Amino acid sequence: MKLRWFAFLIVLLAGCSSKHDYTNPPWNAKVPVQRAMQWMPISQKAGAAWGVDPQLITAIIAIESGGNPNAVSKSNAIGLMQIKASTSGRDVYRRMGWSGEPTTSELKNPERNISMGAAYLNILETGPLAGIEDPKVLQYALVVSYANGAGALLRTFSSDRKKAISKINDLDADEFLEHVARNHPAPQAPRYIYKLEQALDAM
């Protein structure tokens, strides 16, 4: 798999020389993954509750916060899975039937943060991304949507959600990555997929 991944990157980058090279600078996932793995018992519990692969949760923790539960970004994304209270946090609260949004202290609590991150992944999978058939493509779509929003991803295929999902189902994982690299408005979107693969390989 690693050789296939490397060979694909060479071909893709050769064909996209005018695009941002999302593999540079190289990202060493070893330390972030080691730090994220300490939260695996919580990730397993949250994954079981929400039907999300705990390895995917761990990879997102490694990418988003490097395993630091107190991490706060410039855009005020908070905690291990870098949840924004006013967007994904509010969506999770709504799914749970609660009003308002999570507090900063709640988002810095590892168990609450991971639970909300897993819940949000479930919201994406059963909502805007519902119908994606290939498990690997779904995994890629989940992380791109987690980082940059499902709407931004789907609009690169069609303004109509059903048509977008149908077009996604015509692609394998490598073709999906190439589409994201060529068409997604956020340069970090394909890099997130690159980091995901690095993190999964480091586990």
UniProtKB/Swiss-Prot annotation:
At the top of the EC hierarchy, this enzyme's class is: lyase
A GO CC term?
Answer: cell outer membrane
Write down the HAMAP family for this protein, in alphabetical order.
Answer: EmtA
The biological processes this protein is annotated with in GO are: cell wall macromolecule catabolic process; cell wall organization; peptidoglycan metabolic process
Tell me what topology the record assigns in the membrane.
Answer: Lipid-anchor
Q: Where is the signal peptide?
A: 1-15
* UniProt protein name: Endo-type membrane-bound lytic murein transglycosylase A
Q: Catalytic activity, per the record?
A: Endolytic cleavage of the (1->4)-beta-glycosidic linkage between N-acetylmuramic acid (MurNAc) and N-acetylglucosamine (GlcNAc) residues in peptidoglycan with concomitant formation of a 1,6-anhydrobond in the MurNAc residue
The major lineage groups are: Bacteria, Pseudomonadati, Pseudomonadota, Gammaproteobacteria, Enterobacterales
GO molecular function, one example? Answer: lytic endotransglycosylase activity
Lipid linkage positions (N-palmitoyl cysteine): C16
> Recorded E.C. number(s)?
4.2.2.n2
Q: Which PROSITE patterns match?
A: PROKAR_LIPOPROTEIN (PS51257), TRANSGLYCOSYLASE (PS00922)
Q: What is its main location?
A: membrane
Gene3D superfamilies (alphabetical)? 1.10.530.10
- Specify the superkingdom: Bacteria
Q: Which UniProt keywords apply?
A: Cell outer membrane, Cell wall biogenesis/degradation, Lipoprotein, Lyase, Membrane, Palmitate, Signal
Lipid attachment site numbers (S-diacylglycerol cysteine)? C16
Locations listed in the record: Cell outer membrane
Report the source organism.
Escherichia coli O127:H6 (strain E2348/69 / EPEC)
